Amino acid sequence: MAGKTLYDKLWDAHEVKRRDDGSSLIYIDRHIIHEVTSPQAFEGLRLASRKPWRIDTNIATPDHNVPTTPERKGGIEAIVDQVSRLQVQTLDENCDEYGIVEFKMNDERQGIVHVISPEQGATLPGMTVVCGDSHTSTHGAFGALAHGIGTSEVEHVLATQCLVAKKMKNMLVRVEGELPAGVTAKDIVLAVIGKIGTAGGNGHAMEFAGSAIRELSMEGRMTICNMSIEAGARVGLVAVDDTTVNYVEGRPYAPKGEQWKQAVASWKGLVSDADAVFDTLVELDAAQIKPQVSWGTSPEMVLAVDQCVPDPAAEADLIKRGSIERALKYMGLSANQAITDIKLDRVFIGSCTNSRIEDLRAAAEIAKGRKVAANVKQALVVPGSGLVKAQAEREGLDKIFLEAGFEWREPGCSMCLAMNPDRLESGEHCASTSNRNFEGRQGAGGRTHLVSPAMAAAAAVTGHFIDVRELIQGSAA
């Protein structure tokens, strides 16, 4: 009998009942809640005269709609947009009514859901984790089975602590070798998406493995698992090792004392067996990965920074040719245009993909001693949580950014999506550390280019895309 994958082990440990239709009832350990997908779920509970089944498994924070400017210090009443204000207020009221732990807008622990749960130790190895947000795959970096759910499922988890789901296939993405200097976790996952496409992981749980993955910090692993959904996989996973355990130890929600020792002992088994069989295998050589830049309107439209935008005339497939033509038109780019010739109007460093302390350090290293280019109208740095912000300020990173001409903001989802005041104007090009470059994602008509934090900072100070390794080596100014 073949061994089990990590996904198999997590699934089996949480399968309550297998149903006749092939689906299963799965127990949920951690439910993370934000202001956008929860109001209808709570209202559904009331209409059915139900209450949350287990209060202690829920943790909440507002993130999508909160302003990142000083206006938030005035409280909910200071939020200008009426819908945003109502959603944040409703989350507060629902959590207060049911006694759910919430890090409210001006709590230092507030932040993006996929940043605050890991930093609190609320995401633990071996858990099932769900949230009404597709980037819940982030938490798979801890060897947890994590994925996004819809609003009706949010209500179902609140009411029953279970979900009905069908088991997925197993995919292994193996990245071996040593990453070149200046190449990051973001570049790995963009390269993976560029290789297999946004549908490549459909129907799969995607486990990332190999020497290059093992060398990543937890921040890097979270970045990679965060974007597994952009490769079509609802679930991204990394096996548990000492890096995982060391990150979790001592955090507020982490086990303590004898329970900690028992937990660590059980977590050590959260790896795929040596003889486990995967349905799909994808392999990359880390040494061959270069800094990546998305050029089009899908994350799979991505290239190394030293390449040129594709020419639709060179594409034999008529459907793909049409897709390239539409993307070029929307993005305002020309066939065969060098990536390094793309000029930027705005830069955004933040989001649940890249707003942790390691990300801010990488960007600050590039920004230090330099100035935001004259053609860049705005360069935003938005920490993923109040605790990340405080840590960055203790390290003086805020001063580096401010002296370089960046704006230093309060935590939130910010310009990742046009649901708050931080957004692009039509026709503007933005170097963004977020995860999606769909049409209108950052604002109607906005043109998004996905990059790593270091690449975003490099674009900010040069005004166009540049191989960040040139700045690291000091050969460009």
UniProtKB/Swiss-Prot annotation:
GO molecular function, one term: metal ion binding
Pfam family, one: Aconitase
One biological process term in Gene Ontology: L-leucine biosynthetic process
Role of this protein: Catalyzes the isomerization between 2-isopropylmalate and 3-isopropylmalate, via the formation of 2-isopropylmaleate.
Cofactor note: Binds 1 [4Fe-4S] cluster per subunit.
Pathway(s): Amino-acid biosynthesis; L-leucine biosynthesis; L-leucine from 3-methyl-2-oxobutanoate: step 2/4
Keywords: 4Fe-4S, Amino-acid biosynthesis, Branched-chain amino acid biosynthesis, Iron, Iron-sulfur, Leucine biosynthesis, Lyase, Metal-binding
E.C. numbers: 4.2.1.33
Oligomer status and interactors: Heterodimer of LeuC and LeuD.
UniProt similarity note: Belongs to the aconitase/IPM isomerase family. LeuC type 1 subfamily.
Binding sites annotated in the UniProt record for [4Fe-4S] cluster: C352, C413, C416
Cofactor: [4Fe-4S] cluster
Protein name: 3-isopropylmalate dehydratase large subunit
Gene behind the chain: leuC
Catalytic activity: (2R,3S)-3-isopropylmalate = (2S)-2-isopropylmalate
Disulfide bonds: none
